[in-house]
């Protein structure tokens, strides 16, 4: 399942779906950060 982050519109996996916690940081250190198009 793929969702779109309401703040940036990037595709993110439900595992990394943090949009429900607020806007994820573009400097997110995680390799699967929403700021990256994997």
Swiss-Prot record:
The keyword Secreted applies. InterPro entries: Natr_peptide (IPR000663), Natr_peptide_CS (IPR030480). GO terms for cellular component: extracellular region. Expressed by the venom gland. One of its GO terms (biological process) is regulation of blood pressure. It comes from Dendroaspis angusticeps. It is found in: Secreted. This is Natriuretic peptide DNP.
